[in-house]
Amino acid sequence: MEDGKPVWAPHPTDGFQMGMIVDIGTDYLTIEPLNQKGKTFQAAINQVFPAEEDSKKDVEDNCSLMYLNEATLLHNIKVRYSKDRIYTYVANILIAVNPYFDIPKFYSSDAIKKYQGRSLGTLPPHVFAIADKAYRDMKVLKMSQSIIVSGESGAGKTENTKFVLRYLTESYGTGQDIDDRIVEANPLLEAFGNAKTIRNNNSSRFGKFVEIHFNEKNSVVGGFVSHYLLEKSRICVQGKEERNYHIFYRLCAGAPEDIREKLYLSSPDSFRYLNRGCTRYFATKETDKQILQNRKSPEYLKAGSLKDPLLDDHGDFNRMCTAMKKIGLDDAEKLDLFRVVAGVLHLGNIDFEEAGSTSGGCTLKAQSQPALECCAALLGLDEEDLRVSLTTRVMLTTAGGAKGTVIKVPLKVEQANNARDALAKTVYSHLFDHVVNRVNQCFPFETSSFFIGVLDIAGFEYFEHNSFEQFCINYCNEKLQQFFNERILKEEQELYQKEGLGVNEVRYVDNQDCIDLIEAKLIGVLDILDEENRLPQPSDQHFTSVVHQKHKDHFRLSIPRKSKLAVHRNVRDDEGFIIRHFAGAVCYETTQFVEKNNDALHMSLESLICESKDKFVRQLFESNTNNNKDPKQKAGKLSFISVGNKFKTQLNLLLEKLHSTGSSFIRCIFPNLKMTSHHFEGGQILSQLQCSGMVSVLDLMQGGFPSRASFHELYNMYKKYLPEKLARLDPRLFCKALFKALGLNEIDYKFGLTKVFFRPGKFAEFDQIMKSDPDHLAELVKRVNHWLICSRWKKVQWCSLSVIKLKNKIKYRASACIKIQKTIRMWLCKRKHKPRIDGLIKVRTLKKRLDKFNEVVSALKEGKAETSKQIKELEYSIDASMTKIKTTMMTREQIMKEYDALVRSSEQLLSALQKKKQQEEEAERLRRIQEEMEKERKRREEEEKRRRKEEEERRLKSEIEAKRKQEEEERKKREEEEKRIQAEIEAQLAREREEETQHQAILEQERRDRELAMRIAQTGAELSTEETKLDVGLCRANGTKLQMTAEQMAKEMSEMLSRGPAVQATKAAAGAKKHDLSKWKYAELRDTINTSCDIELLAACREEFHRRLKVYHAWKSKNKKRNAETEQRAPKSVTDYAQQNPTAQLPMRQQEIEINRQQRYFRIPFIRPMDQYKDPQNKKKGWWYAHFDGPWIARQMELHPDKAPILLVAGKDDMDMCELNLEETGLTRKRGAEILPRQFEEIWERCGGIQYLQNAIESRQARPTYATAMLQNLLK
């Protein structure tokens, strides 16, 4: 199969594995893995892809691959990753795989210099190349740019963002202090906003959009950082293997002893906000020695330090202090920041217990007194006020007027704990806002022409337990994925269609319904959550119930017990919900959703913190007193500031900014869950590539044009350098001349209606044209002028030649018209007078023989006069007949009657002469005359026989034409009947198509949900029982990895495919048949066709055999080599007819299966695709011959003028023959296509077909057909 070429087939853990096709099934292919000879498994046919011939080859741009599909994309990334080439392009999109180690000199200053001003694709893929492209686009297009760095947590987004910022400031900075400040801002932001998670040691727990602003000279003048959604819940609690924000650990590990004493710091295990997570520091061998023992937690002392090449808490503290100094923070302000951070830690150590009184409140535990004192001192609060504010809440009554009585309500232990945590979150979030503001103050700018923005925001997150933070992060990623879909897929395809480029449409999953579910007005999850917050007694359970109630049948929303993970099935319906995101289904536990959505403190704590004695603490809260209060909130109720809608507003503003700028994309990929170098988990990576839209982009870029410029834009760029004669040119003509002058290959670009477009990998050529320095433009103008002169001279030459050719053509046509006219006239005259001419010739021949009669008579001795008289009478009769034929319009029958009478007379006369002739000499002469007459008679009979044969052939042809006309009339009647029915079923078909589209979307979503569940399960969760049966390749909770068998994987793939419409139709038809052949192998079908005597089984096998051939050829056509010509096993007119007129599957000809099937023969013109446009005069036109034995083709021939005939017979050459049945080809409806058997057999024999078929029969390769049976009878 497939000429022994390898293919990629699905693999549960590696994504794909290489194998060979060994059999074609109903809707699957049987694959033999290359590394497991003798073992086979089945794979859905749409999940199998052809592989590159050289499996070790890698390319820098995936669009350069010979086969563009997700398997070769994954393999190319894998090969490059094994060579430490972590960057790869898909057109102008960069794929970055996290290496988890520092590649030497890869991001050095020398590397930066190397990429400056270089076009995309001229150097190996690099994040620097994308940064430089964004800069050049900004400079040339006079438009701000955005670089969207996306990917899941741990994929390397933060590091790539830092590299982009560093590249822009080093390459295009002014060389002043501001360049360093932009770069040094990152360590400070990371210290306060990054933390260790399960999947990432340096995970950004906030989103940021960093703008680098440029002046009119395109030099860096300043920057601005916008931040989004800091994860505040992490301040109070973390997972077992996770940590709080880096700043806490760096302060504990690296702070000098004097600062440590001032802040009352100790080891991380001493603080509630740190000791419930991981309390180990990141450290190297050197820094581990520098950390004092009393700063290390027991866990650290037992297990040692955490290792990461980019993190070192002790060393990073010093680097953070240096960064603070560089961005302008003095020692006092630095100490203020540390003081608030320490205050938050001590605040977390305040504990409560039930009060002994009847008030039902609580009091501080005795052992919490030191923590209370430290916290109050560090935050500038009164100790007693802090105690009271944490254990009571102030309420105002409205008795009879606006002013009311202040009432202090005691808080229970749980409420006091919540109040303490809320205060800690608020203080830290305000501190983080202050840090970002100070960062922005350190690189101000007065004027800005354009900016380049770099977006680094938390990637799609999915854990065993997901809360409000993951909900907001994933909502953000849904919006960004939609932006990617619109910018790269939707807008790109709309532009191609508008410009008339004829690029094939690429389908992608639209996630607008998921976004509407979250943000729709009144019924969206965010608005429902806000309404819940405004209730007097809000609850998470009520909120969850309302969400399920308002979106009961929504495809994207589901209840937890439908999760594919067992841990989620224990969650009650009012405790969570599942949202099916673009990357897969995530189960959110709604506990604390209501609390986390409210960013406001209760009145007691708000008043306390705003009246702090510490100036720095007061400043943190001055700008946030009532700015964010909910305008719908009524007086007297608890204050409410919606976190969700605030984030939604920020996100919409961000997307408006992204839509107004040019876009570049960096898709970051994490290679494995263990966060180790040189370990490639193909299944994980494939899922990330599919979710990020890379596979759809690859499909689009097969015929896409990622670079473009408008004609007017190019023309205006060159206009001031153009001489007057060139300035008059139309912009489109000027662009054409420009490209020709540069010698660009026409296949590398394409002209639209208003723009010119460039193929992927041709960015260097595009940049050469768009380069705007005066010397370069002037040089190109010279080239254009030279090309125009040459092209116009060539045009004059071609015009002269064309006029001469036209003159010759007119003369030729005139002579051809005369030739046609005289030929037609000749034919008409011939048809009219041919019988008479033939009759005259025959009669004249008879008259010539009278001389011989006279010679005989002259030799007679007696009866000469009487005999002469008889001869004269005969001669008179002949002359009379000739005159009659000449002067009278007679039919052939009349002429033959006259002629036969004369022949009889002459024969009677001859008989009489024979009686009279006695001598031998005379008898011999008479004998000779008789022989001549006998020859004449035989000649006449042969001629008559030939004439009748010609008449018979004409009759057969007329019968064939009459039959074709009858079939055409019947077809027209059927079509009229179908049109009558079509109106009734059209709506039904439209509904079915819509349902199928939705069903395919559901299948795709289920696949992503299952993959996401598998990825979560690999971190330690357990799949549900049903999913475990499907996904045997998962790591279960006990850590044992089970490999999915080939049969299990095939079953899963087949189940996914079996719901498709074509397969359902086939299976429904198969169910109605007597024989179920769905599980038969391809070879079994072929052998049965060759050997079976069961007519019904034979017909069923033939039908299934050719159906599988059609499926296989469709797969080959879809997965052909890039830019390769489509294989043609039949003329294009035949295949086009089959595509445009799909025939319904009929029920076995109503079981009428005849042994002697009808034999039909056809001939139609055939021109090879490669010669279609090279040969306008059809000099290379060939002929395609086909012999159909019943509905299926038995023999096939291709005759071309410049190559040897191609002979094919059924059985031996099935893969190269037309796989369509006779009805599907439409040949019976083509006028003049059907020929006589004799015409086919003559050509077949002349081309050596008999010997070819005989060899196939002898080698047992030919399938038994009418042709093989006739040849075998002939040989016998």
UniProtKB/Swiss-Prot annotation:
- Cellular component GO terms, alphabetical: actin cytoskeleton; actin filament; cell cortex; clathrin-coated pit; clathrin-coated vesicle; clathrin-coated vesicle membrane; cytoplasm; cytoplasmic vesicle
Query: What segment(s) does the record annotate as region Three-helix bundle?
Result: 835-916
Q: Which Pfam families does the record match to this protein?
A: MYO6_lever, Myosin-VI_CBD, Myosin_head
Name all IQ domain ranges.
813-842
Changing residue 1091 to E has the effect of: Abolishes binding to OPTN
What keywords does the record list, in alphabetical order? Actin-binding, ATP-binding, Calmodulin-binding, Cell membrane, Cell projection, Coated pit, Cytoplasm, Cytoplasmic vesicle, Endocytosis, Golgi apparatus, Hearing, Membrane, Motor protein, Myosin, Nucleotide-binding, Nucleus, Phosphoprotein, Protein transport, Transport
Intracellular or extracellular location(s): Golgi apparatus, trans-Golgi network membrane; Golgi apparatus; Nucleus; Cytoplasm, Perinuclear region
Topology relative to the lipid bilayer, per the entry, is: Peripheral membrane protein
What segment(s) does the record annotate as region Interaction with TAX1BP1 and CALCOCO2/NDP52?
1051-1267
Write out the ranges of the annotated region (SAH).
917-984
Task: Give the residue ranges for region: Disordered.
Answer: 934-957, 1117-1151
Where is the region Interaction with OPTN?
A: 1107-1109
Effect ascribed to mutating residue 1088 to E: Abolishes binding to OPTN
Q: How is it modified after translation?
A: Phosphorylation in the motor domain, induced by EGF, results in translocation of MYO6 from the cell surface to membrane ruffles. Phosphorylated in vitro by p21-activated kinase (PAK).
Q: Which named protein is this?
A: Unconventional myosin-VI
